[in-house]
A protein has these predicted regions:
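FAD-binding beta-loop-beta segment adjacent to the flavin cofactor pocket
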Residues: 301-327
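Predominantly flavin-linked oxidoreductase catalytic cores and closely associated redox partners
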Residues: 110-258
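N-terminal Rossmann-like FAD-binding beta1-loop-alpha1 element of flavoenzymes
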Residues: 3-28
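Redox-cofactor binding/interface segments in oxidoreductases and associated redox assembly factors
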Residues: 7, 151-152, 327
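Helix-loop-beta segment of a Rossmann-like dinucleotide-binding subdomain
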Residues: 75-92, 135, 203-208, 261-268
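Conserved N-terminal/central alpha/beta ligand/cofactor-binding core
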Residues: 19, 25-26, 31-115, 158, ...
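General small-molecule cofactor/ligand-binding pocket signal
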Residues: 109-111, 291, 326
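Flavin-binding catalytic cores
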Residues: 214-240, 256-303
Length: 327
């Protein structure tokens, strides 16, 4: 039985682990924090626009399990918000334990608080000169050997990158101060990563949303969120900042409406569709006088920075130059 090692337990890592297990592999999934899903714990938007087709295609091809969970845990279905139609909003507070139980039931070996920091390379190369990985090394010096490795560590962190290319560590769901920084497996294997650029040439992009404690909002806004799933609050002209639109990772949410309004979505928290919004200014908005950030905790100042480490790969998701590393 082939041994597949997945590094990173976000949505992509969980999907890769599930697919490998269904294909008959012995699968180990390592995640540096104490929870799976990573940024999926603060996501929540599914089936909007073309994602509906993508979801149904995956389900038809036999990859239905994870979509089944998000569908089951959707707080709202078939809702519209600026630029987006027929969206579902899954409950980000409830989703992670359901996914973890599914993977465990499938026989996947899950290791949490297990941060990969280095690799062991094979001295041999393939006939075409590509390198081969033998194992990953965790922060406690444990080695995990495998036949195939899949890097799903994402492109965010460590804290120094958020300081250099953003507004500092804003204490997001990745919790780098507690669980340690992300380490690029492709770089440890001797390959180069690509760094994304913004329009102004700066590296990386800001995560495009935050979370407000729903109970900190007015009763009227809470009621509308619970009933409809979305609240759009117009901003005064002097509060509009279109510059932040170019900072966003997800450019499908970089429409003018997201600068001219506060757009809130009910994902268990109140998902605020802007990279950051100063708390003092936010509390001037009617209904948000007592607003408080839940993620990132410093959402009034900034957000996590992504796209700082992207592996070069082919169309089969194999990392260039390494025979048995996928991404």
């Amino acid at each position: 039985m082939d041994r597949v090692v997945i590094i990173g337990g976000g949505w992509s890592g969980c999907a890769a682990a599930l697919a490998a297990r269904k294909a008959g592999a012995e699968v180990t999934l390592v995640e540096k924090t104490d929870m799976l899903l990573g940024l999926g714990n603060v996501g929540g938007i599914m089936r909007n626009n073309g994602r509906f087709t993508a979801a149904e295609e995956n389900i038809a091809l036999g990859a239905d399990e994870l979509f089944g969970i998000t569908d089951k845990l959707s707080r709202h279905v078939n809702i519209d918000f600026p630029g987006h139609k027929h969206a579902s909003l899954y409950d980000v507070i409830k989703v992670e334990p359901h996914v973890k139980r599914l993977l465990e039931e499938k026989g996947i070996n899950i290791k949490t608080i297990a941060r990969a920091v280095d690799v062991v390379m094979d001295n041999q190369k393939t006939s075409n000169g590509d390198k081969l990985m033998k194992a990953i090394i965790l922060s406690d010096d444990t080695e995990i050997a495998g036949d195939v490795f899949v890097e799903c560590t994402g492109s965010t962190g460590p804290m120094g990158n958020c300081l250099t290319y953003g507004n500092g560590c804003c204490m997001c769901i990745l919790r780098c101060p507690a669980f340690g920084p992300r380490v690029s497996i492709t770089q440890k294997a001797g390959m180069n990563d690509i760094m994304g650029h913004r329009k102004d040439g700066a590296f990386g992009a800001f995560s495009g949303s935050g979370k407000l404690e729903k109970s900190s909002l007015s009763d009227e806004i809470q009621r509308e969120l619970n009933e409809k799933g979305v609240v759009v609050i117009p901003l005064k002209p002097e509060e509009v900042s279109k510059d932040k639109l170019d900072l966003k990772v997800c450019q499908q949410y970089a429409l003018n409406e997201y600068a001219q309004n506060i757009v809130l979505l009910d994902t268990g928290y109140a998902k605020i569709m802007t990279p950051f919004f100063p708390l003092e200014k936010l509390r001037r908005v009617p209904g948000l006088e007592n607003a408080r950030y839940a993620d990132p905790y410093a959402g009034g100042k900034g957000n996590s920075i992504r796209y700082l480490s992207v592996a070069e790969r082919d169309d089969k998701m194999r990392v260039t130059g390494i025979e048995n590393l996928l991404c």
